[in-house]
Amino acid sequence: AASGLEAAMKAAGKQYFGTALTVRNDQGEIDIINNKNEIGSITPENAMKWEAIQPNRGQFNWGPADQHAAAATSRGYELRCHTLVWHSQLPSWVANGNWNNQTLQAVMRDHINAVMGRYRGKCTHWDVVNEALNEDGTYRDSVFLRVIGEAYIPIAFRMALAADPTTKLYYNDYNLEYGNAKTEGAKRIARLVKSYGLRIDGIGLQAHMTSESTPTQNTPTPSRAKLASVLQGLADLGVDVAYTELDIRMNTPATQQKLQTNADAYARIVGSCMDVKRCVGITVWGISDKYSWVPGTFPGEGSALLWNDNFQKKPSYTSTLNTINRR
């Protein structure tokens, strides 16, 4: 059996096991990311978002994004680039601009061409459109939807395809894992893009999950069979699927029992990817609980990743590795 997550995924016929990354000087984290048996893909956590790269119109800030791209390419890792068109972390000049259909499309095109052009040939995957759905499966309100209508989604894919035909183009969202109205909305988006005669290569399921009911999520992680059926239903549209931002949070503080329940939830998610041929990879949203976004966003919740604050492997690490090795 393979001794690391990336090695195990490769042995299982998958493409990668990855992590989100914010470059920082912490040797404990760096040592894990340097281990090619453990990690094989990097997603910049924030450095490639619109407000980070183009905070003012025509003013591009490439330093952090370049640094994160180099973190992947220097190690020979895949680079899941994230994200081009999203309502959040969008600079106010875009969100509050006085646009019409034509001028907003020009802004989208300029941004997509600049960003995808700079990293062309480095990004193995791109999250082209992120979080375009409400929980009921309708389209989320955004400047893009208000000005252009639902066509902004296929338009973004068309622009992305023109800017870098070599990368895999994804739609990415959260709460798609439950087989509900939002899942159906993601299927509608895939069909919409294809109806324009365009390519959509994959659907990313963020997989920000819980291992027990919490104040922010009533429904803990579903069964492996349920998760696999959801993945297969998406893959049946002719797209790859991936878990792109996996973390499984709990009400803190953690206990041994909670950590084991959490490990079981990880096994269900990871196992569902093993069960679906077109599930190409898994990315966790960070290495260690020390830097997880969860406690800051969901107070009283946490312990959501595979390594603890001291970079020790948790029960969730063991269950993840064992599940991949068992397939």
UniProtKB/Swiss-Prot annotation:
Residues 1-323 form the GH10 domain. InterPro entries: GH10, GH10_dom, Glycoside_hydrolase_SF. Keywords: Carbohydrate metabolism, Disulfide bond, Glycoprotein, Hydrolase, Polysaccharide degradation, Secreted, Xylan degradation. Pathway: Glycan degradation; xylan degradation. GO terms for molecular function: endo-1,4-beta-xylanase activity. GO terms for biological process: xylan catabolic process. One of its GO terms (cellular component) is extracellular region. The active site is at residues 131, 245. Optimum temperature is 40-50 degrees Celsius. Catalyzes the hydrolysis of the internal glycosidic bonds in heteroxylans, releasing mainly xylobiose and xylotriose. Most active on oat-spelt xylan. Monomer. This is Endo-1,4-beta-xylanase A.
